Amino acid sequence: KLAGEKLMPMMAEKTDLAPRLHVLPDFHGNRSPLADPEALGVISGLTLDQSEESFLKLYWATACAIAYGTRHIIDAMNDTGYDITHIHLSGGHTASKVLVKLYADVTGCTVVMSDCEEPVLLGSAMLAAGALDAEGGLARAARQMAGKETTHAPDPSAKADHDRRYAIFHQMHAHRQSLDSMSKT
């Protein structure tokens, strides 16, 4: 939380906080869209600097990498005919203003968050109520039970920097794959 509080003002001043620091976040493999459980994480541009600013830049680059992974999934889905324009976000990521902003800016999607503290549980309750309501069903239950939403639109001024970093993200995937093939005996 402290890192996010320090990063938000920095992100308001410029859209690329670490132009030469890049992360592939696959430290536990890649589930989607590559479906490679053996994929490894990569950090490029790491220095020996131990300052708070250096830590914040690494945190930010890692948060970007998580958002680029989400964009990679959305792009793969859109390439097969979907037209994803909104991300409905719930859970732990909603607590990070940095991630919420990056999801919007990186993907170009509007991020929608329920003001309900537990939106997944609310959705389950809506399904149960809808199943019990023979006349109105799920649609009526959802209308009656839904709370307010908060939306976060992408910042168009961040697009060029994130498009450049996203291209680097893809190049790092290709480099990692090449290095992996050279490393196999």
What is each PLM-predicted segment?
Residues 47, 113, 126-130, 148-152:
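Short amphipathic alpha-helical patches
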